Amino acid sequence: MAMESECNVVELIGGFFLKATLLVCQPRTGAIEGDGEEDRTFNISSAADAGVAEAVRAWTAYDGAQELPPLVIEMFLDLRRLGPQHTVVLKDQDGNPWNVCKGGKKSEIMLERWLVELDVGNEEARPEEPPNAAEIYKQLVLLFRYLYTLTQLLPANELYARLHGPSNQGEAAMPLINIGTRILDGSKPILSKGRVGLSRSIIATYTNVINETNVASHLEQKKITPISTGYGSLRITVSYRRDCNFDVNEVLDYEGNNCSSSSVVDTHTKPGVGPLSSLRRVSIHSNRSMSISPQTVYSGTVIPDPSPQRKSSSSRIQPFKAGSVGSGSLAIARNPSGSSAVATLRAQRSGSASISTHVADQAVGEPSSVGSGGSKYSSSFGKIRRQSSMRRSGSLELPAAKQAKPGERGSDELLDFVKMLEEKQELNVKKLYGTTTDISSSLVRFQSMKSNNDTLSEDLSMSYSLEPTHAPQVRYRSNSHSPIPSISPSVQYTSIPMRLSQSRNVSQTELASRKNSAERLKTLISSRTGSFSESRRQSNAGQEDILEDEDDEAEEILLSKSHLSNPTGTRLQSMSPQSLKSISSYNRAAVPFKPVSNFSCPTTMATPAHAKLHKASISSSPDNQSGLVKKDHEHSTMTGGDDDDDLLFFMSDMNLSSQ
């Protein structure tokens, strides 16, 4: 019985190595295909494979006397079908690609490494009564069920399912990359020459991860609970990569027979040949062109073509747009026929054609049109020679770009454009020194005008306050002892010109204007009242002389506003020069001015006539006084009794109080 039990245990150990190899390799590799038979050992089905059985013969032929070496099962990504145009990348958890290698550089990438062994260990640690074959069998059933579950959860299984998914069933039989397995003797050294080993960290972010164990940060390690036997412990350990989302980028170059222009890169994603859905190819089709525009997404790798036959470009590039001139819009439309763009621009702005702009024949851009493609690189830079006559609104019209030489490439145009940008051009910046000087002088002049402006504002306020409040009936006085001619109060004085300064040096132009004004006033009064006496004209002439000497004292007051009344009811006469008071003797409160608003700026108003009353500086003598009384008496006898009424009405409008 003991011998039979030991034979069963030895047989279970051999079956353990075979079943573990089948469960690890079969679900995630297409290389192992069963012949239709199933292996139902340990109550779990698996396809029987003669190749796997032959590979593990050294472990299945265990007789209990020999020492078994560890069994190593490597699972790798086969890259032997890739060419130099392929690039293998690995995407991390965020979807960021990390370059692994180019095709032909490495033959494979290690994904997993399994270690199946019979650990003899220390014989003293073995139990005195080892378990029998039935107990070991039950424990192995649980172990293989756990092993099968673990293989379905590893990242390599997801990669296999993606490569061999239902979406790739219609592709070719052999993909460019595939998952393979290898069975090795663990007692021999394992070389990683020509392949990406398991210890290599592809994603650089794992180098910053703090790891307290001996396992690398980009790897994971799982251990299955060992099963003790009388010959040692059965152990299974696996180390695998955390990330296995590998992809292959391929750039293929196809030349079309019916294409007269050079091929331009057109990138797109395409499933790989065979059942590989993750293979992305960047194909270059000769019958497709590239248009660099905001709507075009450009990605991929461009392989330069040294062939001299493809020198033309089938793309159209418009790197810049010019702004508008005036109120119109500037538009450069694509013109594939190579004709002038003026007609196209005129068609676009059908509503605004009010500008006549003449542009010389010099072209703005130099597009390239090589071969039969007929496409152009149009640029808004170049030498512009314009002769423009612009009206109120319109747009700038640009002529068509001239044709380039047939032998030029599109890249030469771009290089010339970059060189033009790098050239340093002098900027005509206007110096502000003269402008600063002008501003300073303007400020000085403005400050000097402030005092004059204040004086003018005050004078205008006083002039406005002296405006008559009512319009009396027109009456004329006939008797006056004043040397200033009397005028009708019906004339409305909206403003009284006053002096802005107290300088005594009055210009000859101002004196002449005053004389002319006095003459006009005398003419007007003479037409209304009749004729003036010779003594009156002499008095006016004498007053003009006095005006030149004493124009700075009484020029700012119109004494026609003063109110003089005679309480005795006797005949009223105008004031003589001896009875006039200077306006400077009146207090501001004594003069009944109307409240007016302050003027912030000089105000001018048109007036029909101006009257100025000046204080006479001559002293009166008895002879002069008697002469004036005599002349006044003679004049009063000629005009009659109505003169008294006229004089009374005129004097009543003088509103200056006699306080």
UniProtKB/Swiss-Prot annotation:
It is found in: Cytoplasm; Preautophagosomal structure. Residues 364-382 have a biased composition (Low complexity). GO terms for biological process: cellular response to nitrogen starvation; Cvt vesicle assembly; mitophagy; piecemeal microautophagy of the nucleus; positive regulation of autophagy; protein localization to phagophore assembly site; protein targeting to vacuole involved in autophagy; regulation of cellular localization. Residues 525-542, 562-579, 617-627 have a biased composition (Polar residues). The keyword Cytoplasm applies. Keywords: Autophagy, Cytoplasm, Protein transport, Transport. It comes from the Eukaryota. Belongs to the ATG13 family. Fungi subfamily. Activates the ATG1 kinase in a nutritional condition dependent manner through the TOR pathway, leading to autophagy. Also involved in cytoplasm to vacuole transport (Cvt) and more specifically in Cvt vesicle formation. Seems to play a role in the switching machinery regulating the conversion between the Cvt pathway and autophagy. Finally, ATG13 is also required for glycogen storage during stationary phase. This is Autophagy-related protein 13. It comes from Eremothecium gossypii (strain ATCC 10895 / CBS 109.51 / FGSC 9923 / NRRL Y-1056).
